[in-house]
Amino acid sequence: MSMQDPIADMLTRIRNGQAANKVGVTMPSSKLKVAIAEVLKEEGFINSFTVEGDITNPTLVIILKYYQGKPVVERIDRISCPSLRIYKKRDALPKVMGGMGIAIISTSKGVITDRAARQAGLGGEVICYVA
């Protein structure tokens, strides 16, 4: 049986891994998942990530981050789903928790945060919120 929403699966694995105090989580890899992991690493929500395995079956390994024994990611929510895509113009990009969190946006220039999209004057698909 095929997976309906691989990005929601990725976010759920991160959420469940941190709830269970796991060191890391593994999942099937894709270009979009690697781009999301890169944004999470740049923003300090995960320690690191690697892509392992061969070209035909790559696996994404994400090393989770904790601060004083508590998960750094308090909330991670999928916004745009395959059945209901959510697009925002540059003027309507959301602020997560009053600027304390980030929204990950897929734009024509790649996957970036809401802050970077505002600075570049780009809109796009709102993939998820992370706080």
From Swiss-Prot:
Gene3D superfamilies (UniProt xref): 3.30.1370.30, 3.30.1490.10
Gene Ontology biological process terms from the UniProt entry: translation
Presence of keyword Ribonucleoprotein: yes
Cross-referenced SUPFAM superfamilies: Ribosomal protein S8
PROSITE patterns the record matches: RIBOSOMAL_S8
GO molecular-function term, one example from the UniProt record: structural constituent of ribosome
One Pfam family matching this protein: Ribosomal_S8
Keyword annotations of the record: Ribonucleoprotein, Ribosomal protein, RNA-binding, rRNA-binding
Annotated GO CC locations: ribonucleoprotein complex; ribosome
Protein family according to the UniProt entry: Belongs to the universal ribosomal protein uS8 family.
Function summary: One of the primary rRNA binding proteins, it binds directly to 16S rRNA central domain where it helps coordinate assembly of the platform of the 30S subunit.
Quaternary organization: Part of the 30S ribosomal subunit. Contacts proteins S5 and S12.
Name this protein carries in UniProt: Small ribosomal subunit protein uS8
Source organism per UniProt: Hamiltonella defensa subsp. Acyrthosiphon pisum (strain 5AT)
